[in-house]
């Protein structure tokens, strides 16, 4: 999606927010059409908790196959909007580049915004309650289904931004079978496990450690 938007708009700065919006809409549809249906039919049993995980992994395979069918399996290039050459301090060039700085500031900004939403707003309270104790949340009057959809939309927007920024910050090359695509998924999951699957700051700390 990010590649297509960059190609059509010719402007990375326009493509980035559009990718986030489309990522949010796509994730919301996945939750409504797939995850919600699975949860309704698999609320009990030893594998109930991992059914959504298995489903999303299957969906990932379908998406990768679809990408290959539409755009082919050849590598496609996305040009970075900023220089990837490190800043110069005197005669020395440091490892931090303008592109690195953009990614760093974006991550910090997103963590602060999401942290505020989760900790300081009624929406955040509803999101946490729906995740930890959906039955109790529903008894308290929270529309768990709608809140879960909002949570997926937020995750989709953040994921779209992360994918597009990491692509241009890395090799700039993306394809369904690219190593960078696989590493992004693998390291993202490992970072979440290291930092705690229920902790946003912990997940960021896990990513920094990696």
Region locations from a protein language model:
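Helix-loop interface residues and adjacent transmembrane-helix termini in multi-pass membrane transporters
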Residues: 8-10, 120, 146, 196-197
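Alpha-helical transmembrane segments within multi-pass membrane transporters and channels
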Residues: 10-59, 66, 205-210
